[in-house]
C-alpha cells in the first residue's frame, strides 16, 4: 500500500500529524474500510433503523466536521471515501486540536480522545469509559505502527515509479 504511505506522508508534511497516529486513527475508526458506516440502531432489537451518526469512510468523519474541513482547507472536492482526503482530514484535525486544546501532535491517547469526543466535549472524557478504552487501544496501535514504520521507512521512502 505504497500510495497510502505516500498520502499519509504528505499529510504529515502539511499538518505535522505523525503518520503512525493517522493510521492508528483509521484502524480504530474504520479498520481501513473505505465505505465504513456505523451500524444501524435496531427497533425492537430486530428491525434496522437509523444510524447513530453521519460518520462515513476511512476517517469516520461526521458531516458537520467534514464540511468545516472542506471550507477551511478549500478542498471542495474532498470525499470521505478517498484515503488521500481522509488522512488529510485527520492531519487537519490533529493540527487544529493542538491549536485549540494544546495537545501535542504525537500524543496518540489524548489526540484520539479529542477526535472521538470532539473539541467541545473533550473536557468531559473522564466520564466516558468507552472513550478511554478506545484511546488506550489507539495509543497501543500507534506505538506498534511507529515501530513498524521505523523498520520500513527506507523502503517506503524510495520512489516506486520509474519515469522514462
Regions found by a protein language model. Name each.
Residues 1-159:
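Catalytic glycan-binding domains that act on GlcNAc-containing polysaccharides
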Residues 163-164:
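Short, solvent-exposed mixed-charge patches
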Amino acid at each position: 500500500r505504497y500510495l497510502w504511505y505516500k498520502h499519509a506522508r504528505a499529510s504529515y508534511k502539511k499538518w505535522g500529524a505523525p503518520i503512525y497516529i493517522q493510521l492508528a486513527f483509521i484502524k480504530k475508526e474504520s479498520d481501513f474500510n473505505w465505505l465504513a458506516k456505523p451500524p444501524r440502531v435496531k427497533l425492537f432489537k430486530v428491525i434496522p433503523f437509523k444510524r447513530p451518526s453521519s460518520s462515513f469512510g476511512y476517517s469516520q468523519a461526521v458531516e458537520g466536521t467534514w464540511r468545516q474541513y472542506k471550507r477551511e482547507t478549500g478542498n471542495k472536492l474532498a470525499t470521505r471515501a478517498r484515503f488521500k482526503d481522509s488522512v488529510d482530514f485527520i492531519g487537519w484535525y490533529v493540527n487544529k486540536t493542538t491549536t485549540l486544546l494544546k495537545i501535542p501532535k504525537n500524543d496518540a491517547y489524548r489526540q484520539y480522545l479529542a477526535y472521538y469526543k470532539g473539541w467541545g466535549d473533550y473536557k468531559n472524557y473522564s466520564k466516558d469509559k468507552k472513550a478511554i478504552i478506545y484511546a488506550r487501544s489507539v495509543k497501543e496501535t500507534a506505538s506498534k505502527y511507529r515501530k513498524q514504520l521505523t523498520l520500513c521507512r527506507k523502503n517506503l521512502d524510495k520512489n516506486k515509479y520509474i519515469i522514462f
